[in-house]
Amino acid sequence: YDRIYGNVYQGIGLGCYSFGESRQIGNPVAFYLFQGARIARICPWLSFNYEWNFGLSGGWKPYDEQYNSYNKMVGSKINAYLNANFYLRWALSPRLSLTSGVTLTHFSNGNTNFPNAGVNTLGGKLGVEYNFYRKEDLTSLHAAASYHIPPFQRHVSYDFVFFGSWRRKGIWMQEGQYPLPESYPVFGFNFAPMYNVDYKLRLGVSLD
């Protein structure tokens, strides 16, 4: 499992943000799903990893012409939250690790309301991890290297996704751009036959 999928992990998380302008945009709180795994093992105690987060964020102060007219970024109280992390993990002991890397974050309402410039951040990541359930020690990694991985049976699988949302648009006039007063629904689907090449790679085409 560790050799095939890079010790993948999933869970739920809670994040709090402050941009130093709480009066204009608020102090958002994000609730999200996350998944991460090892991309490459540099040596027995050092690895390069990724983690993505996807969820919703609240606590925003949407644009109001009278109270926060400088807020040209956020038009909704609830916004989508997307985050990607790339980091190094140093194993200090079988259970304790030090992490350091970069993190990219995007907040947006998907054009469901205006304004929708969104908020994008780039930052550093520094943390300490403690694993309550890890029983292996670092030397067991060498023993795992001799474990035989079963050959992958290549096959075809199918992905089908149906989605729906709503959207608002603006129109250009001589005085400038003005938002339309109403939103409209958007629906769609995609169907993708996928050829499973190995344990971690699938290739295919999609009909949207």
What do these predicted regions represent?
Residues 1, 33-39, 52-56, 82-90, ...:
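Residues on the lipid-exposed face of transmembrane beta-strands in outer-membrane beta-barrel proteins
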Residues 90-98, 134-138, 199-203:
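Repeated loop/turn-to-beta-strand initiation elements of outer-membrane beta-barrel proteins
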Residues 120-141:
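Outer-membrane beta-barrel "beta-signal"
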Residues 14-20, 54-62, 104-108, 132, ...:
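Transmembrane beta-strands of outer-membrane beta-barrel pores
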Residues 1, 139-192:
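Short glycine/proline- and aromatic-enriched beta-strand/turn motifs that initiate or cap beta-hairpins
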Residues 8-12, 48-54, 98-102, 124-126, ...:
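Transmembrane beta-strands of outer-membrane beta-barrel proteins
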Residues 6, 25-31, 76-82, 118-124, ...:
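Residues that define the transmembrane beta-barrel architecture of outer-membrane proteins
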Residues 1-22, 33, 42, 178-208:
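Glycine- and aromatic-enriched membrane insertion/assembly motifs of diderm outer-membrane
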